[in-house]
Amino acid sequence: MEPVLTQNRVLTVPNMLSVIRLALIPAFVYVVLSAHANGWGVAILVFSGVSDWADGKIARLLNQSSRLGALLDPAVDRLYMVTVPIVFGLSGIVPWWFVLTLLTRDALLAGTLPLLWSRGLSALPVTYVGKAATFGFMVGFPTILLGQCDPLWSHVLLACGWAFLIWGMYAYLWAFVLYAVQMTMVVRQMPKLKGRAHRPAAQNAGERG
């Protein structure tokens, strides 16, 4: 019975980190768009990126994996992947074609969820290409924002930041192609659930392409 209790826990270190990251999203919007305090924006992005990497490690190390965490962590990740590009677009830091490319990819990905749910799945396994894309964005976005703060190093920071962002974008799109191939195999090989389709258990929600 002990693993069940662990799965149902709410007050865990990883969950608290996810809640903090969630609370920092409106703070990030404010400091960049209203306060024009890009330094604080960089700090929020760095903290969010490091804590996102750390919460999974902590969950395994302290045996604090939970159903809430499996839902909350990827949900917060998606909110960041929507919010940050839009904020950068509104600030004129990145062009809108870049923002729309990322948002269109995520919208297409979200459109496949009903197909997964109808077959008892919540998501497909994350790929190394997807992880590489996430790393590129985690480094690229704060580096470009930091380039807005320091005129002395702006050329170097912007060049490095854009290198990571372009790399991340291509990896992000390639991960979607791999996801589409996986989705095609799932649709062809797995029959729909009989009776009323339902969302699967939350423990698989952390797996995303």
From Swiss-Prot:
Which GO terms of the molecular function aspect are on file? cardiolipin synthase (CMP-forming); CDP-diacylglycerol-glycerol-3-phosphate 3-phosphatidyltransferase activity
Q: Which domain of life is it from?
A: Bacteria
Asked if the Swiss-Prot or TrEMBL record annotates the protein with the keyword DNA damage, the reply is: no
Q: What is its EC number?
A: 2.7.8.41
Annotated membrane topology: Multi-pass membrane protein
Annotated Gene Ontology cellular components are: plasma membrane
UniProt entry keywords in alphabetical sequence = Cell membrane, Lipid biosynthesis, Lipid metabolism, Membrane, Phospholipid biosynthesis, Phospholipid metabolism, Transferase, Transmembrane, Transmembrane helix
From the UniProt record, list the reaction(s) this protein catalyses: a CDP-1,2-diacyl-sn-glycerol + a 1,2-diacyl-sn-glycero-3-phospho-(1'-sn-glycerol) = a cardiolipin + CMP + H(+); 1,2-dihexadecanoyl-sn-glycero-3-CDP + myo-inositol = 1,2-dihexadecanoyl-sn-glycero-3-phospho-(1D-myo-inositol) + CMP + H(+)
Subcellular location as annotated = Cell membrane
- Note the InterPro entries from the entry: CDP-alcohol_PTase-I, CDP-OH_P_trans, CDP-OH_PTrfase_TM_dom, CDP_ALCOHOL_P_TRANSF_CS, Phosphatidylglycerol_P_synth
Q: Which GO terms describe its biological process?
A: glycerophospholipid biosynthetic process; phospholipid biosynthetic process
Q: Which residues cross the membrane?
A: 27-47, 82-102, 126-146, 157-177
Role summary: May catalyze the biosynthesis of cardiolipin from phosphatidylglycerol (PG) and CDP-diacylglycerol. May also catalyze the synthesis of phosphatidylinositol.
Descriptive protein name: Putative cardiolipin synthase
Specify the species: Mycobacterium tuberculosis (strain ATCC 25618 / H37Rv)
**Name of the gene encoding the protein in the UniProt record:** pgsA2
